[in-house]
């Protein structure tokens, strides 16, 4: 109780106690109190740091945590990061990933790929049966093991039917003993169903009485095998993305690329391909002499077809392939191909085709050219070729001894002579992800995907990336205002889908689509065909129906990302949303540099030389001002020249700047947009420095962003495989996807203080977006 006059109350006992202390003891007691206060202050400061600098300014944290349960420590060497280093398990793991690849002896301004990825080859081996290895394939390998662990577990009675069918398919695929005893029989049975393989049957083969058009329609209806002589699809109408149309196109070729065919039958790859055809026929029971003669004839027939086909670079223009006909008009343009008979046989009673149904013919010259070839080719040759392509497509279902030549053919294409075949489980995982896409995807999401945190992070990333791309559109000096408004409208309307389709966890939908039962002793090949035909029937039934834009056309369990121009949407499956691309619990300079650049890449695809021809609704539409379009084309020519000037020493070949143009535009736009998005995120969070990664205390956040980006593309490639990539792949080899976009970025040169004219800071740079 306080006295009225405010004087302190006297306590004699306490005074007596203090009174007995000497002056020295009093000073020591005061010092002890100060020491305890100082220690408590240090402890409080330490807890403050561990809690992620949760100091508030204007109601917001100076350093907002990019993840939960962070762990950081003070490190005076981390001058660029306010003396703070991240010590969480995620940060340590990511730092180890970067450090393992880093070659710090290289000057980053001389060769940044070698700086960032130079030790990748020292710490990673290139398997004898692989043509290349890179960061993406490493993630795919880990995902394959994750899928394997789920599918190999025993099937229990109380499991969902779609889980049972996915596991049952995989486990049946693994049964090599069954394949050894039934694989040839199952394949011969399928060949018999489609009219027989003459090479196997010899003189006993009976020629079919119907036309070749009806024959390939029959093959499609009975097996789901499509791209033989021609390829048919029910797909988006290029001019009206809300509806579906029939599309007819040239097929894919048995040897892969069309390039070896251009050299004729004596091309080494085609000789290997013809040998494969003969060996397969003999493995299935053909007389070697008959196989020799008739597979040569089949090869010559395919060669004639390829001669009328279009080059991939020419096919890049979507407007060129938008050749629209009504069904009744096809006869006048292609008088010797009965497309009406073919299509009506394919659709049967599922959809009633009228003469006015729209048909898109992507390659008019191809179909005009092959008419006379097909007229003059004996049915026996046609039947041999069709049967061969059927068996080739189903080669994973052959016994091991009959599969071996297929592995060797592929290996020889990429310089892997006498390489061992992959383990069977790898093939079976791949087949399961393709054939059981949604059941396997659901299992993967349930077991290995952090849905809430990952989806939340992707929402943040896509929002920042989209906003930054739109900001870039606002300041382009070569784009007129009308085109700019349309471009901004398109960018705003891009739909971002990440993780998995919502129907994946709709049990009713899963039961309807994947409630099938594996029949006792059903051949693996027959089960596969049964699944293919269900999916193919669904495709046919989409004709004339409103398009369901919520559909996904690949499994969530895939390491991939893509932009679909006819839907104006981009999809990021759960498979790519994992370490190292999306590592939850690391600073954002890593996240934006890795998966952020992937998002930026896909955003840029909406405006590359192909995607830019589609409007905001996904319709093929000339929405560009003519002068602006010419300026755009001129800027893309800079990329073509830049990439084609690069000489790949390992294969003594230059990059193909035209074939890879769309991907190069996207790579360059992607890293720029991701870097600007990171800066925007940082600005919106008061700009405080994020913690360093352990071992990278001397790097700035900007340097770490570019280091993370380059680590997307660390790779090992066999020299011969470089040739195949450059001639046939729309992507540049990984090394150059890391290097060239950074050579074009002034922000990179500034971050590493690269002098103008140095290899990583050339005077002439290319940029579109």
UniProtKB/Swiss-Prot annotation:
Residues forming the catalytic site: 602, 667
UniProt GO cellular component terms: plasma membrane
Membrane topology: Single-pass type II membrane protein
Extracellular side of membrane: 48-769
Residues the record lists as binding Zn(2+): 601, 605, 663
Keywords, sorted A to Z: Cell membrane, Disulfide bond, Glycoprotein, Hydrolase, Membrane, Metal-binding, Metalloprotease, Protease, Signal-anchor, Transmembrane, Transmembrane helix, Zinc
Calcium as UniProt keyword: no
EC annotation from Swiss-Prot or TrEMBL: 3.4.24.-
Cytoplasmic side: 1-26
GO molecular function, one term: metal ion binding
Superkingdom as given in the UniProt entry: Eukaryota
Family: Belongs to the peptidase M13 family.
Name of this protein: Neprilysin-21
Gene from which the chain derives: nep-21
């Amino acid at each position: 109780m306080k006295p009225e006059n405010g004087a302190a109350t006297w306590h004699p006992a306490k005074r007596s106690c203090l009174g007995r202390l000497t002056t020295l003891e009093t000073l020591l007691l005061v010092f002890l109190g100060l020491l305890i206060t100082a220690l408590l202050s240090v402890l409080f400061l330490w807890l403050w740091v561990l809690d992620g600098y949760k100091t508030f300014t204007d109601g917001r944290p100076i350093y907002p945590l990019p993840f939960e349960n962070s762990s950081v420590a003070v490190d005076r060497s981390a001058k660029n990061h306010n003396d703070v280093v991240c010590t969480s398990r995620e940060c340590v793991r990511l730092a180890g990933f970067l450090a393992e690849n880093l070659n710090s002896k290289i000057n980053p301004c001389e060769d940044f790929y070698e700086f960032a990825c130079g030790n990748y080859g020292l710490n990673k081996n290139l398997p004898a049966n692989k043509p290349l290895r890179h960061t993406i394939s490493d993630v795919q390998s880990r995902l394959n093991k994750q899928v394997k662990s789920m599918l190999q577990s025993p099937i229990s009675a109380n499991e969902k039917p779609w889980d049972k069918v996915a596991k049952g398919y995989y486990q049946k695929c693994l049964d090599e003993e069954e394949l050894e005893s039934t694989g040839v029989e199952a394949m011969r049975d399928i060949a018999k169903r489609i009219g027989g393989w003459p090479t196997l049957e010899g003189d006993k083969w009976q020629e079919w009485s119907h036309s070749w058009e009806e024959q390939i329609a029959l093959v499609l209806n009975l097996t789901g095998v499509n791209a033989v002589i021609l390829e048919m699809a029910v797909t988006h109408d290029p001019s009206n993305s809300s509806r579906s149309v029939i599309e007819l196109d040239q097929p894919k070729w048995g040897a892969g690329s069309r390039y070896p065919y251009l050299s004729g039958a004596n091309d080494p790859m085609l000789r290997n391909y013809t040998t494969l055809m003969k060996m397969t026929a003999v493995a299935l029971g053909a007389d070697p002499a008959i196989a020799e003669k008739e597979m040569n004839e089949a090869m010559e027939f395919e060669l004639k077809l390829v001669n009328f086909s279009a080059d991939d670079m020419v096919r890049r223009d979507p407007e060129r392939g938008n050749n629209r006909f009504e069904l009744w008009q096809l006869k006048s343009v292609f008088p010797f191909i009965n497309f009406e008979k073919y299509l009506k046989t394919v659709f049967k009673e599922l959809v009633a085709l009228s003469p006015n149904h729209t048909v898109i013919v992507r390659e008019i010259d191809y179909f005009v050219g092959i008419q006379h070839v097909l007229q003059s080719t004996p049915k026996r040759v046609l039947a041999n070729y069709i049967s061969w392509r059927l068996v080739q497509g189903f080669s994973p279902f052959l016994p091991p001894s009959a599969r071996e030549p297929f592995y060797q053919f592929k290996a020889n294409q990429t310089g892997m002579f006498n390489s061992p075949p992959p383990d069977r489980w790898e093939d079976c995982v791949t087949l399961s992800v393709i054939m059981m896409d949604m059941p396997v995807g659901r299992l993967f999401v349930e077991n290995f995907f952090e849905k809430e945190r990952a989806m939340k992070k992707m929402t943040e990333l896509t929002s920042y990336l989209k906003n930054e791309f739109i900001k870039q559109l606002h300041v382009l000096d070569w784009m007129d205002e009308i085109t700019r408004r349309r471009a901004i409208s398109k960018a705003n309307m891009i739909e971002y889908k990440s993780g998995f389709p919502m129907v994946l966890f709709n049990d009713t939908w899963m039961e309807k689509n994947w409630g099938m039962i594996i029949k006792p002793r059903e051949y693996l090949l027959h089960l596969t065909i049964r699944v293919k035909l269900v999916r193919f029937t669904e495709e046919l039934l989409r004709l004339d129906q409103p398009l369901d834009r919520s559909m996904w056309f690949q499994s969530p369990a895939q390491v991939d990302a893509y932009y679909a121009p006819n839907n104006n949407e981009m999809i990021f499956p759960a498979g790519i949303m994992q370490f190292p691309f999306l590592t939850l619990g690391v600073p954002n300079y890593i996240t934006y540099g890795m998966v952020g650049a992937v998002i930026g890449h896909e955003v840029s695809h909406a405006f590359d030389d192909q995607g830019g021809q589609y409007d905001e609704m996904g319709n093929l539409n000339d929405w560009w001002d003519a002068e602006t379009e010419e300026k755009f084309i001129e800027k893309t020519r800079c990329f073509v020249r830049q990439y084609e000037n690069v000489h790949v020493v390992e294969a003594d070949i230059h990059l193909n700047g035209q074939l890879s143009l769309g991907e190069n535009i996207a790579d360059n736009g992607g890293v720029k947009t991701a870097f600007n998005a990171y800066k925007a995120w940082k600005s919106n969070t008061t700009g405080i420095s994020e913690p360093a990664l352990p071992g990278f205390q001397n790097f700035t956040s900007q340097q770490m962003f570019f280091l993370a980006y380059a680590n997307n593309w660390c790779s090992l490639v066999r020299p011969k495989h470089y040739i195949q990539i450059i001639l046939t792949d729309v992507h540049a080899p990984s090394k150059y996807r890391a290097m060239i976009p950074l050579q074009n970025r002034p922000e990179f040169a500034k971050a590493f203080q690269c002098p103008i004219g140095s290899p990583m800071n050339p005077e002439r740079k290319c940029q579109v977006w």
